[in-house]
C-alpha cells in the first residue's frame, strides 16, 4: 500500500473513532475573505483557515476543518489556550491516552488510540474533529503564522464592516440589479482586494 493511500485511510478511520459523534451535522459554512488556508495533512483532508468572517459584525476567525464539511471555529483566545496546553497534550499522548480530558476554554481535548496510532479529538458544543498526533503537531507549529496573520486581518476589520454596510445599502435600494449597482457606485474599487472578494463571495451570489 503506498503512503498517500495509507494517509487517506488513516484520515477516514479517525472519523469512525468512538469519540467522534457522526450524528452531529456540519453547520453552514461561514463566508470568510482575505483568508489563508494551511493543509494539516499530506492529503489536504484536514486544514486550518484564518480569515475575516463577513458580518455584521465582521471579525477575524480561526477555523479547523475537514473535507466532509466539519468546521470548528476558534477565537484567538481559545487558539492561544490550545497552544499553551501543547506540552500537556503531548505528554498525555506519550503516556496514557485513557486519562481525563483537558479543557481549553469552550473546547474539550480528548485522547484515544487506534491501531497503535495516538489520536486527539477537539470537542466543542456542536462539532468534533479527530486528528492524529502528527496532524495536531503540524497545526500547533503554525502558531506564529496565525498570530501574524490575525494581527494583519484585525487591522482591516473596520474597513470590511464599512464596505459591507455600503454595499448592503445599495443592494437593499436596488433590488432588480444590485450587482451592477454596486459595481457602478462610488464605493466600489475594483482594484482593492476587499471590494473584489466581498463582491465575488457575498454580493454577487445567487439569492
Please identify what each model-predicted range represents.
Residues 6, 12-73, 77-207:
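Positively charged, low-complexity terminal tracts
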Residues 2-3:
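Short, exposed "boundary/linker" segments that immediately precede the start
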Amino acid at each position: 500500500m503506498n503512503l498517500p493511500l495509507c494517509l487517506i485511510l488513516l484520515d477516514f478511520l479517525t472519523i469512525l473513532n468512538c469519540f467522534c459523534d457522526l450524528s452531529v451535522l456540519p453547520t453552514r459554512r461561514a463566508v470568510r475573505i482575505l483568508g489563508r488556508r494551511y493543509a494539516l495533512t499530506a492529503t489536504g483532508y484536514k486544514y486550518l483557515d484564518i480569515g475575516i468572517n463577513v458580518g455584521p459584525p465582521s471579525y477575524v476567525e480561526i477555523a479547523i476543518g475537514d473535507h466532509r464539511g466539519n468546521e470548528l471555529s476558534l477565537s484567538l483566545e481559545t487558539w492561544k489556550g490550545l497552544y499553551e496546553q501543547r506540552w500537556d497534550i503531548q505528554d498525555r499522548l506519550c503516556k496514557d491516552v485513557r486519562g481525563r480530558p483537558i479543557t481549553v476554554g469552550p473546547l474539550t481535548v480528548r485522547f484515544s488510540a487506534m491501531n497503535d496510532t495516538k489520536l486527539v479529538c477537539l470537542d466543542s458544543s456542536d462539532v468534533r474533529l479527530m486528528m492524529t498526533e502528527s496532524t495536531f503537531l503540524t497545526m500547533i507549529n503554525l502558531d506564529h503564522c496565525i498570530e501574524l496573520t490575525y494581527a494583519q486581518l484585525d487591522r482591516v476589520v473596520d474597513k470590511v464592516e464599512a464596505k459591507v454596510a455600503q454595499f448592503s445599502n445599495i443592494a437593499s435600494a436596488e433590488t432588480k440589479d444590485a450587482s451592477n449597482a454596486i459595481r457602478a457606485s462610488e464605493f466600489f474599487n475594483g482594484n482593492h482586494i476587499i471590494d473584489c472578494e466581498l463582491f465575488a463571495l457575498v454580493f454577487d451570489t445567487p439569492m
